[in-house]
């Protein structure tokens, strides 16, 4: 007794056993076992319900049979009573037909029960199959789906790497192909140039004396033409500058004449009306400088015919190379003459730019009359300057300057 008490004390001291953690595989197996047990329990419950229904149906059938027997007895009793009362007698055949109908009804009921049982068994089988499929898909969802997802991601990564490698290889092949094409074209051009050089060298070796001189003369003419064109350009630029200066000077002359048409009162009284100026008044004072009057004036428009005449005068300067030199000298002389007359004496006749006889014409113009002026060009003789052209003998073929080079031949190709 004491030992049993000690053992009970030890059990009480130890307390409830501690739960041991199982590995994942055993935990999955336990989980599946629990699922199976739950399914079996559900099936057992369904079977139990079906058995109860079957028992109820059997009880109902037995009750119906008892009721049938009671009804038959009741009918027989009624028949016997009716028979006793003189009613028509029910024969054996009628009873057999009624019994046959009743048995037929019972057989139909039993057949229906068998069909119902077959349907229930088939439904149970389908239910078990669907339950197994459900368990399989649940297991796949918990375990297999993760593994398959990892496989899918790894395969997608492999496909992406393969695509990237293919793109890189295609780009590399394109670059190499372009480099190869460039090298081939470069080598072909170099070979063509070399062959052209060799062909020209061979042609130079086999040239006769007449064609040799013609080639050399052609090269010399090209150089002379280049020099001539350069000189022509320089002369054209100089002519354009001189034309611009000429137009500026003509504009200044027009402005000076229009200003001088404004005649003062003292000059009008003494020269046009023939009156004497009173001694009290001061004599006419001329402006100190002609340049200051020009700076105070406003520019006045010149008619189109004057500009056309000046353009005609300038158009005569565009001539050949030798004539342009003489025109340049002629324009320079005109410029010097204009500058001399512009800064000459400041006399009264110079201010009017006319003689005293023509002074009345200015007076008759009226206060608002303006004399329109024009410029006319005049052809002048051109003196040609003979240039001494150095005479070169083309027969001296042995000199180093008269040799035909590859560049000279290449210019003809």
From Swiss-Prot:
Keyword Coiled coil: yes
Bias (Basic and acidic residues): 8-21
InterPro entries associated with the record: CCDC83
UniProt feature coiled coil, ranges: 36-186, 216-255
Keyword Coiled coil: yes
Annotated region (Disordered), positions in chain: 1-22
The protein's name in its UniProt record: Coiled-coil domain-containing protein 83
Highest classification ranks of the organism: Eukaryota, Metazoa, Chordata, Craniata, Vertebrata
Name of the gene: CCDC83
């Amino acid at each position: 007794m004491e030992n049993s008490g000690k053992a009970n004390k030890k059990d009480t001291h130890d307390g409830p056993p501690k739960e041991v953690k199982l590995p994942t595989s055993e935990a999955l197996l336990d989980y599946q076992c629990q699922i199976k047990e739950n399914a079996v329990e559900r099936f057992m419950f369904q079977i139990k319900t079906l058995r109860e229904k079957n028992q109820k149906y059997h009880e109902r059938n037995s009750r119906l049979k008892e009721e049938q027997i009671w009804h038959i007895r009741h009918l027989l009793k009624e028949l016997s009573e009716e028979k006793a009362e003189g009613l028509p007698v029910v024969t054996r055949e009628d009873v057999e037909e009624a019994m046959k109908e009743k048995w037929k009804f019972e057989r139909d009921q039993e057949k229906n029960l068998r069909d119902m049982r077959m349907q229930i068994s088939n439904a149970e089988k389908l239910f078990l199959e669907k339950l197994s499929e459900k368990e399989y898909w649940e297991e796949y969802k918990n375990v297999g789906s993760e593994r398959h997802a990892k496989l899918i991601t790894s395969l997608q990564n492999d496909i992406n790497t393969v695509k990237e490698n293919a793109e890189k290889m295609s780009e590399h092949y394109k670059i190499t192909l372009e480099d190869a094409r460039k090298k081939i074209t470069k080598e072909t051009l170099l070979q063509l140039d070399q062959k052209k050089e060799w062909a020209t060298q061979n042609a130079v070796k086999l040239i006769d004396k007449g064609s040799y001189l013609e080639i050399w003369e052609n090269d010399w003419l090209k150089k002379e033409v280049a020099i001539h064109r350069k000189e022509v350009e320089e002369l054209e630029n100089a002519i354009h500058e001189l034309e611009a200066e000429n137009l500026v000077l003509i504009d200044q002359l027009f402005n000076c004449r229009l200003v001088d048409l404004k005649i003062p009162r003292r000059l009008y009284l003494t020269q046009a009306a023939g009156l004497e100026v009173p001694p009290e008044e001061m004599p006419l004072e001329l402006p100190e400088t002609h340049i200051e009057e020009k700076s105070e004036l406003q520019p006045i428009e010149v008619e189109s015919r004057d500009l056309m005449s000046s353009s005609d005068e300038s158009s005569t300067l565009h001539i050949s190379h030798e004539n342009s030199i003489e025109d340049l000298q002629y324009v320079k002389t005109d410029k010097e003459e204009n500058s001399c007359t512009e800064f000459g004496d400041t006399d009264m006749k110079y201010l009017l730019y006319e003689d005293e006889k023509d002074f009345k014409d200015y007076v008759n113009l009226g206060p608002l009359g303006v004399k329109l002026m024009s410029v006319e060009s005049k052809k002048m003789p051109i003196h040609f300057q003979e240039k001494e052209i150095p005479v070169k003998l083309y027969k001296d073929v042995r000199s180093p300057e008269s040799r035909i080079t590859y560049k000279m031949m290449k210019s003809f190709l």
